[in-house]
């Protein structure tokens, strides 16, 4: 029997230390019943159902799981992904948007599957409440950096829960 691998690290930007069992999948939860994030959760749920390969969709059964997302910490890629998703939002919704809304993208800008790196048919964008979009972004950052310790290039999935 092989012992599980434990990786310990210190994140350079925040100087926080922690450990992670590498065999334990990193799964970020978003909730449809959380009024602060329900718009993002709904968008992600629909995107995972319609995008090729159910990208990022978590299921305990590997046969029903989508392809993993991989994190990028490269600011140039993150910014390029955000710019590309913004362009795609304006293209798909030329009538514009109301004040207080943000362009939400899935897969996330902080992944190697973001809008600047994949065809438009592998992306989903939608205008949602800015507060909702920012809340999920903040939670995702905490998940990647502190809770799950997902390093640059490592895999993670997203589970939409009730």
Task: Give residue ranges: language-model regions.
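Nuclease and nuclease-like effector domains acting on nucleic acids or nucleotide cofactors
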Residues: 1-100, 109-162
């Amino acid at each position: 029997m092989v012992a599980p691998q434990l990786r310990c690290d210190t994140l350079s930007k925040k100087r926080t230390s922690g450990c992670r069992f590498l065999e334990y999948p990193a799964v970020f939860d978003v909730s449809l019943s959380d009024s602060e994030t329900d718009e993002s959760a709904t968008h992600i749920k629909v995107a995972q159902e319609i995008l090729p390969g159910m990208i990022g969709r978590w299921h305990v059964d590997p046969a029903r799981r989508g392809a993993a997302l991989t994190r990028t910490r490269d600011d140039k890629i993150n910014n390029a992904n955000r710019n590309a998703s913004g362009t795609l939002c304006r293209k798909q919704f030329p009538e514009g948007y109301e004040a207080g809304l943000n362009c939400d993208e899935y897969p996330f800008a902080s992944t190697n599957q973001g809008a600047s790196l994949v065809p438009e048919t592998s992306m989903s964008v939608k205008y949602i409440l800015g507060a909702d979009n920012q809340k999920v972004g903040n939670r995702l950052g905490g998940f990647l950096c502190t809770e799950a310790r997902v390093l640059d290039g490592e895999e993670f999935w997203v589970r939409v829960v009730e």
